[in-house]
């Protein structure tokens, strides 16, 4: 089929397999160009490995550290009428490139919140790897099916206490709007913590630990975002922030457990990037377009791959073998460049000035749009989007 982008809301409903493969190849080449990560992990499980920071983590481990990787994700292959999800094509490409270099790569397509996912991962680790020395937890899901009861719990992207009104960008019409979001109820806050908090990360690590498949000195990391006062009402001070604070709670509990055998658990606070997850959060697209422009001007811009490589090489797996620098909550801070005072002051000054007319001039808005489309395999140089492509891409994946 000939595949063109179709946008609905903040999701692109079509994906381009050749474009997705090109994206993955670009991240692999970037990793190789940066060089090998000394003291890097060798057997890595990535929960939520098909896009964004999870995919970059799998690439950093495999191509930066020659690690065997096992990826867990929930994606859809193509059907007769429509292409598969971007994460499906991303993983197919990763698997192809990893195997071409003789690297172990296995993937499980399933609900990562389920008991079955954990059982299958443990089984594969026991059979093929013995143990893992790193577990990356990078799930971004709006819904969690509770593994025991089967109840579906939904998260909310809402403020707490009062209605949040702010300048935002309508990414469909490319115009500046005022957006208002009603505050979350107590139940919605609790549900958001259930879906996006640290409980499932704990369930994964405890299951792996009980099964004896975590090596001594095993490191685990889960990803978070804190941001600044520009996004705090909807994010850190909102329902989602409560969930991310629960991730901090889980990190401390897991760290106490793993430290007994020389291991560690940390939350890594990452910078804002264009992902399917961030595009769904009100005000984030506008903030990202602003902050990207300033960071590019200052030579500080990083994409997912740059961030994760820096986390591996300068935090978790330092050449000198020293423990990573953390903040007072034992978090790894990779948002340090974004939070620089001059960068943030620039955004604070700019925010009230943005109009539909000057949007592309004051912020990297067209670059934001291009990055967004790229997530789905579109707008990549050298690809003929009028060519007929086969959407049916298969690879070595276990379906649960």
Curated annotation (Swiss-Prot):
GO terms for biological process: fatty acid biosynthetic process. Belongs to the TER reductase family. Its EC number is 1.3.1.9. It catalyses: a 2,3-saturated acyl-[ACP] + NAD(+) = a (2E)-enoyl-[ACP] + NADH + H(+). The active site is at residue 235. This is Enoyl-[acyl-carrier-protein] reductase [NADH]. Pathway: Lipid metabolism; fatty acid biosynthesis. NCBIfam families: EnoyACPredFabV (NF043048), PRK13656.1 (NF010177). Substrate binds at residue 225. GO terms for molecular function: enoyl-[acyl-carrier-protein] reductase (NADH) activity; NAD binding; trans-2-enoyl-CoA reductase (NADH) activity. InterPro entries: Eno_Rdtase_FAD-bd_dom, Enoyl-CoA_Rdtase_cat_dom, FabV-like_NADH_b, Trans-2-enoyl-CoA_reductase. Involved in the final reduction of the elongation cycle of fatty acid synthesis (FAS II). Catalyzes the reduction of a carbon-carbon double bond in an enoyl moiety that is covalently linked to an acyl carrier protein (ACP). Monomer. Keywords: Fatty acid biosynthesis, Fatty acid metabolism, Lipid biosynthesis, Lipid metabolism, NAD, Oxidoreductase. PANTHER family: ENOYL-[ACYL-CARRIER-PROTEIN] REDUCTASE [NADH] (PTHR37480:SF1). The record marks 75 as: Plays an important role in discriminating NADH against NADPH. NAD(+) binds at residues 48-53, 74-75, 111-112, 139-140, 244, 273-275. Pfam families: Eno-Rase_FAD_bd, Eno-Rase_NADH_b, Enoyl_reductase.
